[in-house]
A protein has these predicted regions:
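Segments that form or flank anion-binding pockets
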Residues: 1-203
Length: 203
């Protein structure tokens, strides 16, 4: 039965949403599962690994009564700037991720959909797909991809739409869900806001 979900956090907003999501998922599970067992609900979003071994060994969910050893999120973090991802990797949730799970650029997309979609998307496409493939290989029965992003910025909208197109072609058998954020058009500080919405929607 398909069950695992890989989360793609794209851009500043996507990674900030992801940070809150992982925090809430852990808190919610802890309130429902005080015995700290690695059950099927938790295995949808997390790996349970034993770090006493090198490389760490993946522990099976089994009958849902395996103790939690060390959780790793089923996620890929993507941003064309390093700031937000670096904050996440230094914060309280840092141990959920490792270097195999994130891709950052140095220049940013500058709120420019075209720069993100036409330059950064193709430039980072192979690396992104390789990281997604690595996460998929750790799944017993992958069900879907969930993308968290904003259409109010360059990376979230441009690279986000590029990734969706690429996944649709390379992995059409899996569901693609989006958690898309947009700010109010009337109060946006970026003059390219409305054209970016149109470009994202056209893809």
């Amino acid at each position: 039965m398909p069950r695992e979900i890989i989360t793609l956090q794209v851009g500043q907003c996507g990674n900030q949403l992801g940070c809150r999501f992982w925090d809430m998922a852990l808190r919610e599970h802890a309130s429902c599962n005080p015995n700290a067992l690695f059950d099927h609900a938790l295995s949808s979003f997390f790996h349970n690994v034993d770090r006493r071994y090198t490389p760490p060994q993946e522990l099976s969910v089994g009958a849902g009564n395996t103790p939690i050893r060390f959780l790793k999120a089923r996620a890929v973090l993507i941003d064309m700037e390093e700031g937000v991802v670096n904050q996440l990797l230094k914060g309280s949730l840092a141990e959920l991720f490792d270097s195999k799970q994130y891709i950052t650029g140095a220049s940013g997309s500058g709120n420019n959909w075209a720069q993100a979609h036409e330059v950064h998307g193709p430039q980072f496409s192979d690396a992104i797909l390789e990281k997604v493939r690595g996460e998929a290989e750790l799944c017993d029965s992958l069900q879907t991809f969930v993308m968290m992003h904003s259409i109010g910025g360059g990376t979230g909208s441009g690279v986000g739409s590029y990734i969706l197109e690429t996944l649709h072609v390379s992995a059409p058998e899996y569901l693609e869900l989006q958690s898309t954020t947009q700010n109010q058009v009337l109060y946006s500080w970026a003059i390219v806001r409305v054209p970016r919405l149109i470009l994202f929607g056209s893809e």
